[in-house]
Each structure stands twice: as C-alpha cells, then as structure tokens.
Amino acid sequence: GQKILRYNKKRFIYLISPSKIEKNFFKNLKEVLKQKKTSFFQLRLKKNSFKKKLIIGRKIQKICKKFKVKFIINDDVYLAKKLNADGCHLGQSDMKIREARKLIGKKIIGITCHNSIKLAKTAIKNKADYLAFGAFNLSKTKKVKYKASISLLKKAQKITNTPIVVIGGINFNNYKNLLLNKANFLAISGYIWKNKKLKPKNAIKKLI
C-alpha cells in the first residue's frame, strides 16, 4: 500500500465518473481536475461495451495524465490492463485481488469493504492499496445496501495505515466531517456531475 501513501492533503478527492459520458463531459473534467483537488479519477461505466469504454478511457486517460491524477478503472481488470491505467477498483463480487495482480502487477488495486472490518482485514492481508468504505450517506449514484459510520472509520484506522476512501452521497453539507475524522480520500460523483445548482467546476471549488 505504499504507492499512494505520499498523498497530498489538498488532493483529497477520489472522483468517480458519471454513469453516462455526455459530450460536454471532457471539457468539464478538465475544468474540475484543474482545481488540483483530485488524486484519483475512476471510470465507472456499467452499460458500455468494452470497445466503447476503451475509446472513452483513452480520452480520459490523457486528461488525467495532464493534471497528474491517477486513472483507475472500476471492476474491469482487462480494461485496466489494455489501457495501462494506474489501477483498478474491485468490488467484493469482482475478480479476486491475486488474480488481478497477475494481470496488472504492481498497479494500484483498491477494494470495496462496504461496512465490514472483516472484509477490510482480508483486503489488507491481500495487500490492497486502498480500502473503500461506505455508504456514509444516502447516495443518488448507487442503491445503498450497506451503511457505514464514523465509528467504523475509526476502527479501520486503528488496524491499518492503508489509505481509506469513504464513499456514498458525499456533498458540500457532509464532506467536512469525514475530513475531520481523517478519511484519506472522499469518493464523490453525484455532487459534481448531477448538481442542479452548480456547474462541475464550481461544485468542486466549494470543497476546501
């Protein structure tokens, strides 16, 4: 997990893509990453073909490189390998970490741990590069099956110094509390991409 321990406190955002890539997305992404608050960008497209994800992925990867943001692929280790992305995020039902390592070697592999210390311990044992816990709040991006709490975050911090990503409905009204409780990265999607009041770049500017 040493790859990302040298993180920059100002870059606390782990940005997740909208579920559909519209044509103004690329311009918005540049404006968002330009704010220098993002450490990771995760491409999470459930409905596109491999080929389409490859085309979109290449465009996004260029933008991420320009702004020194790590480019992570959700679920699809083969896509991560093909794109030579910086890493892959695996859910509990996705490919196992050992299999993923065979494909992408020393790249970043993050693991969804829901609200479970037991899952976190397994991920730590398997040398995950970061642990993702959630949902901390109700989310518009994903149905909430697991509810995570600040006490869970504190427990996880006691057992590991592997970076922790917190996820689930994070927005301007609740992000500060997670930072104060020393979450390393905040996974954010809907607040940036589906904000009815603010453009993406203005939404991210408010998070300081």
Feature-to-residue mapping (PLM):
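Short secondary-structure boundary segments
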Residues: 19, 45, 92, 113-115, ...
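Catalytic domains of carbohydrate-active enzymes, especially glycoside hydrolases
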Residues: 29-44, 126
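Structural preference for beta-strand elements that scaffold enzyme active sites
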Residues: 12-14, 38-42, 68-72, 86-89, ...
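Catalytic cores of alpha/beta
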Residues: 32, 71-86, 115-127, 159-166, ...
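Glycine/Thr-rich beta-alpha phosphate-binding loop at enzyme active sites
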Residues: 82-92, 111-158, 195-203
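Active-site mouth loops of central-metabolism enzymes
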Residues: 9-27, 108-115, 165-166, 170
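Alpha-helix-loop-beta-strand connector modules within alpha/beta enzyme cores
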Residues: 54-73, 94, 99-116, 145-171, ...
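Glycine-rich phosphate-binding active-site loops on the catalytic face of alpha/beta enzymes
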Residues: 15, 90-100, 132-144, 175-208
